[in-house]
A protein has these predicted regions:
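Conserved phosphate- and dinucleotide-binding cores of soluble alpha/beta proteins
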Residues: 1-84
Length: 84
């Protein structure tokens, strides 16, 4: 897979989280087999932790989000990966 795009339930610190272990394990397999790795999350997912942590932000190429993300939150998470 050249590029993978995964939706997530929460991003907290360097942790990428989802609602359940089965979904998280499947998403991790997809990301681990992609050359370029992206997650997609609207601004409400930042500083939010869901049930199962399945990936780390610093292992991703970027997080794709909406224009409503605050500059402070964007700056915080850009220390881990690109925030687009």
């Amino acid at each position: 897979v050249s590029k993978a795009f995964i939706g997530v339930n929460g991003i907290d610190g360097h942790n990428v989280t989802t609602a359940n272990e089965e979904e998280g394990n499947g998403d991790a397999i997809i990301l681990n087999n992609a050359i370029e790795k992206y997650i997609v999350a609207d601004n409400s997912k930042f500083d939010s932790y869901s049930f199962y942590c399945f990936y780390r932000l610093d292992d991703l190429d970027a997080v794709i989000t909406d224009d409503d993300i605050s500059p402070k939150v964007k700056e915080k998470y850009q220390s881990y990966t690109n925030v687009l």
